[in-house]
Amino acid sequence: MFIDKVNISKEEISIYKKSNPMKTRKIIAVGGSPGTGKTTLFRKYMENKVFQPIEPAKLVSAMYNTERDLYILGKYEEGEVFAGTDRLSMAVQPAVQEWIASHNCNILFEGDRIFNQSFLEFAMGLPNTDLQIVFLNVPKQVLEQRYKDRGSDQSEQFLRGRETKYNNLLSNFDLMSYITEFPNTNLEEQGKVIAFLEEHLKV
C-alpha cells in the first residue's frame, strides 16, 4: 500500500490508496525549445478534466487527477505565461526522483527543469515503467514570431544553448527508441499531440 500525504487548498489531508506495485505506470516527458507550445498544450490537455494542485513531496508541486492516478508536475496558475516544471526550484530533480522511485503513479511533465539526460535515463531505468519522450518541433520563423508576441526577453545565447541541449538528447542512442517527434505549429497539429497523450494515459 502506498500512502500519499498531500496539501490541497492549504488543508492537509491524507490519501490512502491501494496500488499494485507491479502495474506498469506511464511517464511521459514533453520537451522542445522555448516557444514550441508546451505549456499551451498542457493547459489544453487539462481542459474538461479535474485536477487538484498538490505538493506530494518537498519542493515537488503538481496537478493531480484521481481518475488516471496522474500527476502533472509543475505549477499551472491562471495568467502565468511560464508554467510547468520551469516554475519549480532549480534543485528539484533529486526530490522528484526520490518521490517517483517510491511510487508507481503516472507522471506527465513539460518544461526545461527536469527534461535532461540524467533524469530521462533515470526514468528509463525504472521498473514496470512505460517511458515516452515527446519532442515538439516548430520552424525557427514561427518561434521568432511567438517570442515577439509574448514579449520574450530570453537571450540568443540562452536559446542557442537550449537548441544544442535538445539536439544532443535527440541524438542520444539510448534514448532514441523512446522519442516521438511532433510538429506543433497549429491547432490541428496540437490535437495530434493531445491524442497521443490521451491514448497513452487513458484509464
Predicted features and spans:
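Hydrophobic anchor at the beta1->P-loop junction of P-loop NTPases
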Residues: 30
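Conserved phosphate-donor/acceptor-positioning beta-strand/loop module used by diverse small-molecule
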Residues: 111, 128-147
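Conserved nucleotide-sensing/catalytic segment adjacent to the nucleotide-binding pocket
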Residues: 66-113
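A conserved segment at the C-terminal end of the G1
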Residues: 40-51
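Short beta-strand-centered segment that lines the nucleotide-binding/catalytic pocket of NTP-utilizing
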Residues: 51-65, 73
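NTP-dependent small-molecule kinase module
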Residues: 2-5, 10-14, 171-203
